[in-house]
Design a protein with these regions (language model features):
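Short, low-complexity disordered leader/linker segments with a strong preference
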Residues: 1-36, 341-342
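N-terminal (or domain-start) structured segment
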Residues: 32-104
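Bilobed "Venus flytrap"/periplasmic-binding protein-like clamshell domains
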Residues: 37-63, 73, 129-196, 313, ...
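Acidic, polar ligand-binding/catalytic clefts
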Residues: 92-127, 207-212
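Pocket-lining segment of extracytoplasmic ligand-binding domains
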Residues: 99-101, 109-111, 137-139, 176-272, ...
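A structural signal for short loop-to-beta-strand junctions that line the ligand-binding cleft
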Residues: 114-126, 131-132, 253-262
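Ligand-binding clefts/hinges and TM-proximal coupling segments of bilobed small-molecule sensing domains
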Residues: 150-168, 241-315
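An extracytoplasmic/periplasmic, membrane-proximal ligand-sensing/linker region
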Residues: 189, 206-226, 238-239, 280-342
Length: 342
């Protein structure tokens, strides 16, 4: 089942590492005879999860295959919702999740009421998942998310993290699924539908710059606007839902022709894993991630957020013992709630 979802870049990374193993000195080859193959779930193409997930998989495979026999493959998915399901079904070993899904799955909230996922463990906070409620400029009335009412609007793929987080935000602002004429499209599908004027807007949350949003801003003759959240709206979202939101400003110039800052909101993205992954493996994954910062920064601008200082921010579930070991070595003070129970 896993291999059906394996994408070419993850495959190429694994092939590259396997070739490197074949040509290494025999002593090193013997050291890596025991192979650990892992799968990390990302999301659809056009956002940030997929390129960053592929980047992490490639980094880990390149850094850890020779000496430790660890190889990692990145797969696409419908996003956080499917990623939680795949972790529950033990189809994947690692996953990128929105903070909303990590918190809800661990605590048994919302969709996961009466069925919490207590086998997930936190590794690190990654980067902010920034809300991009984008609409055609001629559909703008107030400039905030209430403008999506009545529009033919892409909520994201059915069952995706995009759909769930968007509906959660909408519920806090007095809207629901019936408030829009819903379409269920991936990121690039949404941008294409907006360019073709088949829909009036879309929810495309990711770390900026988001490829699908850049595509919209760069299209000649097309005028779009990313809607802004008021302080009151952010307060309502945090007070009435499990969405762990905070203010985020998309700086002017992030997108082609963007002349002003955009005041939106964000939630943390998380790297989590199954408790079944060994302590030594997770320790090595965590160590490689933080000791090679330039690698992921070259993949995407959001790689700059992956730092030791940010590592424990917004984590909903206890740390995996392997990650805990690394952070203790670095002298981090670990909150009691993040210390795994033995």
């Amino acid at each position: 089942m896993r291999l059906k979802k394996l994408k070419v870049w993850g495959f190429m990374a694994v092939v590259f590492v396997m070739l490197a193993v074949l040509v290494m000195p025999s002593g090193q080859a013997r050291a890596a005879e025991k192979t650990t193959s892992l799968v990390i779930a990302t999301a659809t193409t056009g956002g940030t999860y997929y390129p960053m997930g592929v980047g992490m998989a490639s980094l880990w495979s390149i850094q850890l295959a020779k000496k430790h026999g660890i190889m990692v493959q990145a797969i696409t998915s419908a996003g956080s919702g499917e990623n939680v399901n795949m972790l529950r079904g033990k189809e994947v070993d690692l996953a990128i999740l929105q903070g909303l899904f990590g918190k809800s799955a661990w605590k048994g909230l919302g969709t996961y009421k009466d069925k919490p996922l207590k086998t997930i463990r936190s590794i690190t906070m990654l980067w902010p998942n920034v809300e991009h409620f984008v609409v055609l400029a001629n559909k703008v009335k107030t400039g905030n998310p209430s403008d999506i009412k009545g529009l033919r609007f892409s909520l994201g793929r059915a069952g995706s993290g995009t759909e769930r987080s968007g509906l959660t935000i909408m519920s806090a602002l007095g809207m629901n699924r019936d408030s829009v004429k819903g379409e269920y499209l991936g990121y690039f599908e949404s941008s294409k539908a907006m360019k073709d004027k088949r829909i009036g807007g879309a929810n495309i949350p990711a770390g900026p710059p988001v490829a699908a949003i850049t595509d919209l801003f760069a299209t000649p003759g097309l005028k779009v606007k990313v809607l802004e959240f008021t302080d009151e709206q952010l307060k309502k979202i945090n007070e009435t839902t499990a969405y762990p939101g905070y203010r985020y400003v998309i700086k002017a110039g992030t997108y082609p022709g963007q002349k002003k800052d955009i005041r939106t909101i964000a939630q943390p993205n998380l790297l989590v894993c199954s408790e079944d992954v060994s302590e030594e493996v997770v320790y090595l994954l965590t160590k490689a991630l933080f000791e090679n910062p330039d690698y992921l920064r070259a993949v995407h601008k959001m790689g700059t957020f992956i730092t030791i200082d940010n590592a424990l921010s917004g984590l909903p579930a206890p740390l995996h013992p392997g990650a805990l070991k690394f952070y203790k070595e670095k002298g981090l003070e670990i909150p009691k709630a993040l210390i795994p129970q033995k």
